[in-house]
């Protein structure tokens, strides 16, 4: 999996004809963060930030996943979403 493939997928996911489900978006978000940042490096958001907590929790579940593996999984998911929603 190349950086160019990952960058292309990151642009394509923004152009899907239909907005993916919240669950799909969390998957995309968490794998993007793991691929670009690595393990969670911030504190968990506060009690009232439900969206922020969901995103943080999803990313934190990938702790220990290599950036390369997260990148590969991200690109595969974007390809799946392109087939499902169109671009």
From Swiss-Prot:
Instruction: Keyword check for NADP, yes or no.
Output: no
Q: Which residues does the record list as N6-succinyllysine (modified residue)?
A: 8, 17, 55, 77
Keyword annotations of the record: Acetylation, Endoplasmic reticulum, Golgi apparatus, Hydroxylation, Lipid-binding, Phosphoprotein, Transport
Q: Which residues carry this modification: N6-acetyllysine?
A: 8, 51, 55, 77
Which cystines does this chain contain?
Answer: none
From the Swiss-Prot or TrEMBL record, state where the protein is found.
Endoplasmic reticulum; Golgi apparatus
- Could you tell me which InterPro entries the record lists for this protein? Acyl-CoA-binding_prot_CS, Acyl-CoA-binding_protein, Acyl-CoA-binding_sf, FERM/acyl-CoA-bd_prot_sf
Q: Where does an acyl-CoA bind?
A: 14, 29-33, 51, 55, 74
Check the record and name the Pfam families matching this protein: ACBP
Q: Which domain of life is it from?
A: Eukaryota
What biological processes does GO assign it?
acyl-CoA metabolic process; behavioral fear response; cellular response to nutrient; conditioned place preference; fatty acid metabolic process; glial cell proliferation; hair follicle development; lateral ventricle development
Q: Please name the GO terms that the record assigns under molecular function.
A: benzodiazepine receptor binding; fatty-acyl-CoA binding; identical protein binding; long-chain fatty acyl-CoA binding
Name positions with the PTM N6-malonyllysine: 55
Q: Where is the ACB domain?
A: 2-87
- Quote a single Gene Ontology cellular component term: Golgi apparatus
Q: Establish whether keyword Acetylation is in the entry.
A: yes
User: For the modification Phosphotyrosine, which residues carry it?
Assistant: 29
Positions carrying N-acetylserine are: 2
Q: Tell me, how does this one assemble? A: Monomer.
Question: What's the family?
Answer: Belongs to the ACBP family.
* Protein name per Swiss-Prot or TrEMBL: Acyl-CoA-binding protein
Species annotation: Rattus norvegicus
Gene name as annotated = Dbi
